[in-house]
């Protein structure tokens, strides 16, 4: 139950791990994500992990231009126990290839001093670390070695909650077997450092910084004549490009400047809300301003300051911003409880990404002549990865609406393809048509979809969900309350029509419910009826579900 709270998921319901990053389809999307993350924590150094592959150097250059401070090159032989075994043994390339290409590409593009390069994947000795440094790495990641030092026996059952050494399990009986101590890790790292020091001494190098990029100290070992290894040409791997005025080390002075001081959050929101923000208990306050589609991640910086000072404790609508115009990409990303953004206009992609308790309201200007419920007002990938909060959209959303939503509540008047994909929690109400592949990979949460043409079943992915009529009094009450709140927030004519004729529209709604989620909720309810408290009921239901699946 602790893990599920952390992951905003449901006890006993399986998750796809790792979930696909449906907010990244190009280097531009990645650049936007880096910008969003920087806005959400201005003090953070953004680290981007790239898998070693042919062409990774080009991607690394794009990542550096986008403002990342650390690029991690990860190889194929890492020891993760949660990945499929065929991936562990058959997918990927050695970290040496990707590391060398990324390092060389950054030097040739004059970007090497902007970023630190990290390498990982089975760095098991000082020799491995020395080679990584000579190929361009400045930082090094260790996973398998420290785990083995703590007692891991590489059973590769990390995802099954059956770790015999008590390391990767929530089972209290198995956790009693854990014998690891912090001193074991300290000893491992000390011996690793000593091994590295000995190699450096033999090479005549005094510091790790001096070792970075020194491919001239590496020599290709001769392979037996006629062997496959003898046919390999490693010249490119050991190439040491010398570009004028280009460093081979990270320089903090060359870090990318995002210009966050010029954003509306810093110029307007932080100043206008300052008086209320400085109070121990802020008084509700509303401001109005114009926004444009170049104002990316609007509200994110101010939201991060709210989180830093108040956490998620502020009442709804404490800080209310009425925006007129066009919301840029990632409008309202990551905003916390207490912050409400009301947009009179439309918004670009990623609206409400990572919504964390705040409220988003979007509707067209009152004087529009088109049918609001048939026009797109927000772009693709809205509410991606939302964990809490509310969103009311008077209009149609683009594709991949509420992907990996795990706790937010949303009302919208139509969505594109792949709506509610990989959703694990929360509630979504769709007062219009959906695109194809709705609810693919949806393992939690509930969606209510208005099916006026009785053809929704042709567009839903039925692998993990079932369609039911909305009949239970709890569902009817919740649906009606959410539509009412939607109308109050946006003035939606479509929502008002449905409310005024609710008895007529109710039979046309379909409830989308994941199979395992439904089973788990029923088991938890049964345990609570037996007198178990909520937490214990979840634990008992989890093991009941697990035992049933093992039979």
Spans of model-derived segments:
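Carboxylate/His-rich catalytic cores and anion/metal-binding grooves
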Residues: 1, 45, 53-75, 339, ...
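Short, small-residue-biased leader/transition segments that mark boundaries at the very start
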Residues: 3-5
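Secondary-structure transition/capping motifs at alpha-helix termini
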Residues: 37-45, 65-73, 104-116, 133-143, ...
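Glycine-rich beta-to-alpha transition loops that act as phosphate-gripper elements at the mouths
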Residues: 49-54, 114-127
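Catalytic cores of alpha/beta
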Residues: 55-66, 124-137
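Flexible glycine/proline-rich, aromatic-decorated loop/lid segments
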Residues: 68-79, 89-102, 134-174, 450
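Active-site or pore-adjacent capping/gating segments
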Residues: 140, 144, 151-215, 219, ...
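Long, distal/terminal scaffolding or interaction modules
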Residues: 174-175, 186, 199-203, 212-215, ...
């Amino acid at each position: 139950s602790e893990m599920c709270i952390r992951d905003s998921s449901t006890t006993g319901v399986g998750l796809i791990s790792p979930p696909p990053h449906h907010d990244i389809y190009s280097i531009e999307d990645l650049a936007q994500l880096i910008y969003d993350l920087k806005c959400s924590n201005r003090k953070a150094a953004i680290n981007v992990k790239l898998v070693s592959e042919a062409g990774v150097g080009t991607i690394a250059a794009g990542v550096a231009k986008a403002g990342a401070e650390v690029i991690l090159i990860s190889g194929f032989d890492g020891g993760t126990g949660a990945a499929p075994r065929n991936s562990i043994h058959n997918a990927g390339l050695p970290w040496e290839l990707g590391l060398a290409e990324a390092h060389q590409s950054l030097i040739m593009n004059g970007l090497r001093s902007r970023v630190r390069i990290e390498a990982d994947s089975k760095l098991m000795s000082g020799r491995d670390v020395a080679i990584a440094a000579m190929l361009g790495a400045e930082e090094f990641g260790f996973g398998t070695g420290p785990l083995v030092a703590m007692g891991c026996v590489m059973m590769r059952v990390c995802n099954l909650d059956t770790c015999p050494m008590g390391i990767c399990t929530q089972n209290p009986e198995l956790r009693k077997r854990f014998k690891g101590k912090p001193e074991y890790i300290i000893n491992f790292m000390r011996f690793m450092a000593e091994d590295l020091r000995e190699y450096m001494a033999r090479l005549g190098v005094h510091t790790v910084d001096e070792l970075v990029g020194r491919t001239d100290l590496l020599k290709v070992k001769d392979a037996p004549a006629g062997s496959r290894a003898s046919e390999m040409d490693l010249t490119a791997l050991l190439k040491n490009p010398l570009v004028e005025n280009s460093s081979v080390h990270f320089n903090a002075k060359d870090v990318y400047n995002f210009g966050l001081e010029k954003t509306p959050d810093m110029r307007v929101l932080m100043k206008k809300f300052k008086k209320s923000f400085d109070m121990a208990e802020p008084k509700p306050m509303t401001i109005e301003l114009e926004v444009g589609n170049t104002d990316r991640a609007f509200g994110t910086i101010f939201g991060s300051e709210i989180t830093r000072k108040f956490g998620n404790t502020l009442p709804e609508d404490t800080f209310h911003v009425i925006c007129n115009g066009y919301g840029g990409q990632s409008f309202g990303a990551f905003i916390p409880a207490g912050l409400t953004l009301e947009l009179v206009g439309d918004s670009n992609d990623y609206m409400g990404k990572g919504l964390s308790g705040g409220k988003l309201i979007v509707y067209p200007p009152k004087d529009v002549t088109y049918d609001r419920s048939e026009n797109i007002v927000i772009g693709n990938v809205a509410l991606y990865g939302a964990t809490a909060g509310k969103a009311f959209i008077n209009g149609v959303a683009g594709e991949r609406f509420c992907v990996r939503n795990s706790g937010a509540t949303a009302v919208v008047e139509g969505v594109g393809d792949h709506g509610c994909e990989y959703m694990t929690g929360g509630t979504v109400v769709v007062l219009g048509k959906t695109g194809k592949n709705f609810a693919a990979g949806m393992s939690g949460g509930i969606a209510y979809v208005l099916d006026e043409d009785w053809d929704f079943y042709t567009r839903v992915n039925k692998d993990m969900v079932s369609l039911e009529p909305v009949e239970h009094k709890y569902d009817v009450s919740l649906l009606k309350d959410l539509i009412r709140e939607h109308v109050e927030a946006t003035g939606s004519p479509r929502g008002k029509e449905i409310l005024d004729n609710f008895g007529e529209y109710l039979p046309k709604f379909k409830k989308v419910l994941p199979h395992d989620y439904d089973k788990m909720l029923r088991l938890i309810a049964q345990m609570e009826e037996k007198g178990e408290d909520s937490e214990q009921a979840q634990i008992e239901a989890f093991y009941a579900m697990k035992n049933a699946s093992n039979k």
